[in-house]
Amino acid sequence: MYRYSAADYSRTMLYENSEGLDLGAISSDGRWVVYARNNSNADTDLFLIDVAASELELVNITPHEGNIEYASMGFTPDSRQFIYSTNEFGEFSQAWTLSLDTGARQVLIAEDWDVMYVGYSPSGRYRVSGINNVARTVVTLKDLTTGRDIVLKNVPEGDLAQVRFNRDESAIAFGLYRDTAPYDV
């Protein structure tokens, strides 16, 4: 993994991935990197690297026994928490946070179906999540300052994916999967 300068395209190697791990996520401040190792179709490990440390260390942040799946969902906008999904606590995948300051873990979203994704607006005011509910993705957009869900109006029937906010958070873009039409933005 290299860090490139946008000014002159010079590069600095941050980490040599000799283990053949899959890139999971990079924090918005560029300090944290998560890699995944698929041990089988039912067992995954996640590894964290602090690229600002004087000595880079690949830390397994999901030590476990048995078949447990973990997947990277990204970081909070302030780069202080890593978000991941796991089926460690039941049949369905839940979204959890890992505090990068303290190492504390906390459930973020747990439903009666799999949590498919979690994302944030640039400032962190809004959180979007998708839950797979009987082969349909139920999307929730929450204003974290009020705790209220935002109702999306005039959205065609289908599954919303890859929800993105513009910089001032006044609009969103998303992809839409429908069984009667191809994927549309």
Predicted features, each with a name:
Residues 6, 38-40, 51-52, 87-89, ...:
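Short polar/acidic secondary-structure junctions
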Residues 138-139, 143, 163-166:
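Short hairpin/turn module used for nucleic-acid contact or packing/dimerization
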Residues 1, 12, 16-37, 42-46, ...:
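Conserved beta-propeller blade repeats
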Residues 141, 146-156:
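Non-catalytic extracellular/periplasmic "stalk"
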Residues 54-58, 185:
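Predominantly five- to eight-bladed beta-propeller fold
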Residues 5-9, 50-54, 99-103, 143-147:
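Short loop/turn segments that connect beta-strands within beta-propeller blades
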Residues 1-2, 41-48, 91-96, 135-141, ...:
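Structural motif
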